């Protein structure tokens, strides 16, 4: 079920990557992790303002200082709005994100975007590289605005299936679209 969390506010900031809201994820969490849902601004595949959603997964015992980011791009989960990983109970587990427990143990923060149009209203950029990549990079920007989550600019991009496609495009456009991030 898509709840009100995924609805865009009446006034959406023009700046892409702005954190609009966050709350606790109600699905399964990794044994040593804390999971939050985020809603943020992004730019769709056609360059128009859009809203995206996703998950931010951190260690329940974080190491001090800014932490590097693993930007996880999910594989195909369906093309409907209700197919967003952040709407599913097991999207923040080691079965959904390979090596998640090890990544958290090493102190990395995982940002896992749904891509715009999944969870949120709008066109879903299925295998449209620009849209997937912008949504992914903007999820990292939004996660950096979470309280008590200190993200370093160092970002490793990772994905499987559709997420592999998104990861390649994210790496391709990162320098121009999000120059503050070290992808």
Feature locations, PLM:
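Serine-hydrolase catalytic-loop signature spanning alpha/beta hydrolases and amidase-signature enzymes
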Residues: 77-79, 110, 142
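Short beta-to-alpha linker loops that shape the active-site pocket of alpha/beta-hydrolase fold enzymes
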Residues: 76, 114-118
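Glycine-rich "HGGG/HGxG" loop immediately N-terminal to the catalytic nucleophile
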Residues: 117-125
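Primarily recognizes the serine-hydrolase "nucleophile elbow" in alpha/beta-hydrolase
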Residues: 141-183
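Alpha/beta-hydrolase active-site loop
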Residues: 99, 126-147
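Short, surface-exposed "cap/lid" segments of acyl-processing enzymes
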Residues: 44-105
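Loop/turn elements at helix/coil->beta-strand transitions in domains of secreted/extracellular proteins
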Residues: 66-69, 106-111, 152-154, 179-183
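Catalytic-loop region of hydrolases
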Residues: 1-63
């Amino acid at each position: 079920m898509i709840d009100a969390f995924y609805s865009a506010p009446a006034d959406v900031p023009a700046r892409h990557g702005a954190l609009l809201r966050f709350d606790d994820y109600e699905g399964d969490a990794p044994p040593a992790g804390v999971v939050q849902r985020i809603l943020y601004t992004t730019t769709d595949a056609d360059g128009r303002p859009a809203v995206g959603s996703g998950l931010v997964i951190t260690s329940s015992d974080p190491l001090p200082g800014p932490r590097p980011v693993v930007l996880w791009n999910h594989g195909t989960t369906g093309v409907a709005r209700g197919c967003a990983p952040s709407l599913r109970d097991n999207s923040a587990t080691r079965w959904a994100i390979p090596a998640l427990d090890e990544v958290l143990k090493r102190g990395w923060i995982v940002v896992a975007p749904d891509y715009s149009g999944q969870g949120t209203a709008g066109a879903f950029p299925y295998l449209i590289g620009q849209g997937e990549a912008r949504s992914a990079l903007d999820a990292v920007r939004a996660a950096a605005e979470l309280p008590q989550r200190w993200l370093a600019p160092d970002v490793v991009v990772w994905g499987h299936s559709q997420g592999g496609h998104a990861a390649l495009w994210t790496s391709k456009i990162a320098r121009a679209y999000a120059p503050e991030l070290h992808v």
